[in-house]
Amino acid sequence: MINIESSTVKEPADNLALSNAVRPGVVGWAKTIARELGPEGVTVNTIAPGRIDTERIKEVYPDGPTDEDLRAIPLRRLGRPDEIASVVCFLASDAASYVTGSVIQVDGGLIRSLL
C-alpha cells in the first residue's frame, strides 16, 4: 500500500489548519496498518512530495515560482511527476520488500525536519 501525502505532514504550512491537523493522522493510520499487515507480507508506506510541477502548483504560482521560492529548495527547482512515480515504482518493487511504515520525502530537500 502506498499513500501519497504532502511534505507539509512534517512541516505544517501557514493557513492550512484543517489540512495540518489531518495529515499526521493519515501517517499514524499508515504506520498502524503497516504493523497490522506486516505479518501478511504487506508493506505500507507514505510518500511526502514537496513542490512538484503539476497543475496544482500552477494555482499556487500562477506566474511561476520566483527565484526566492526556488532558493528555498536546496536543489533549486520544482520536482517532476515522474520523480514521484519513480519512488512509487521502487516501493511497489521487490527491492523495497523490507521497507514498511516509512514516510519518504520527495521534496528536493525543502523540509528541514530531522524525522
Regions found by a protein language model. Name each.
Residues 73-84, 95:
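A conserved structural motif in NAD(P)-dependent oxidoreductases
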